[in-house]
Amino acid sequence: LSKTLDNMQPFTFLGVFTNGLMSDQALDLLLDLVGRGGSIERQIQFSVLLNWQTMENISEKNHARCKEVAEAILGKNGYGLMFSLNLYSIKQDLATQIWEIDEIYQGLGLPPGQTYKVRVSPAFPIVGEEGHITLPIKDYPKMGRMMLDLLKDFPQLRFRFDCSFPPCLMDDIKEEEYPLVERFIYHGSQSVPDITEWKNKDVYFGCADDSPMDIDPKGDCFNCFPFHDKKLGNIQDFKQVNELSIKKMHTKFLSHAFEASPNEPCKSCPHYMVTCSSGCFAYNFK
């Protein structure tokens, strides 16, 4: 990791995804990188994305270690870490997960009025793979209801979707809750606009097909995790991974994504192909 950083140019971005279970040596390295003498002086945007598990998926000892790692990194650089949650079931204890994350921020002295983002990833299908736990689209409104209630309970919380923001998440919203919608982020950086303006604005919450590519250790390129069965190319196929080569691969991905038609409930949904792309095109291949 340190060698990777040494070879990076200023004003570039490096992100590390971790479950938080690491040795003290690895933690010390991350602390050096997020600190002033690491990525900041080199003008490199470095961040850690920490996957925060539910207690049914992790031991108490390992959960405590994840908290220790998170507090250490946030204590060194408050912008150096973001928590990540998988939305896999309406029965998961999402409230406890958020409470634990909020407790960490409050314990470190998060100023009143300042918000923090929690990255959320719905459990999309993985094309070509059976047995993968998937959040059914029919459960999206109930999941959205859970998230709206949490936004009311934790006023400094914001939810960030790296990719699509399925509008059906808001199917059970009440009019007095409309302002909460703008505390959702989609495509990684855009705040969801006022819900009353959705019909009058050209908004698209669907597949962020122009997002950064996934590149595996062999150099094979994939559009995103749900479509790892569809190799789009290899970085050695191009002299450089520039805008032209990336657009070529995205075009190849979209032609593949539209090979399958939407299933219900998306097929009859008024949002489909207006503001949404079935949450994820991978649902169409089930």
Language model feature labels by segment:
Residues 200:
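Donor nucleotide-activated moiety binding/catalytic core segment of transferases
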